[in-house]
């Protein structure tokens, strides 16, 4: 989020109990209304998350689709059907991700709009999106954490124009 913010994205972090979005799936209620007053020039609102946080973001957006313009999924998939929505969806994961269940990722890919922007970071891993150190079961990254974050930010920034 820090790197996106450096690229003129307003990033709002909603704190979750235990850092797990699944423990408060409605924590984002009222966030847009609150920040529209602070940032009246913002015209597009996106939600995003990493791993389970991404899955929970997708669930939330599916229930509030009229409030959002898009969704960012980092090493995550959506079990909620967003395929007929007008959302701009960005899905980013690493080629060395050992945590993301790729069978489920492929299975649920049909829940996203056909024009979803998808990017596989060559050498990227699951843990680097969370910046919390390597997670048990993750693959061995072939890129540095900073490189992976930079590639993800560049992809989003370029395709958000």
Regions found by a protein language model. Give the residues of each.
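Conserved acidic catalytic loop of the alpha/beta-hydrolase fold
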Residues: 27-45
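Gly/Ala-rich beta-loop-alpha elbow adjacent to hydrolase catalytic centers
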Residues: 48-57
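Short beta-strand immediately N-terminal to the catalytic nucleophile in serine-hydrolase-like folds
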Residues: 44-49, 74
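A conserved short beta-strand
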Residues: 66-78, 88-90
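C-terminal catalytic histidine-bearing segment of alpha/beta-hydrolase fold enzymes
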Residues: 117-161
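Conserved alpha/beta-hydrolase
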Residues: 2-23
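Short beta-strand/loop motif that positions the catalytic acidic residue
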Residues: 85, 91-93, 97
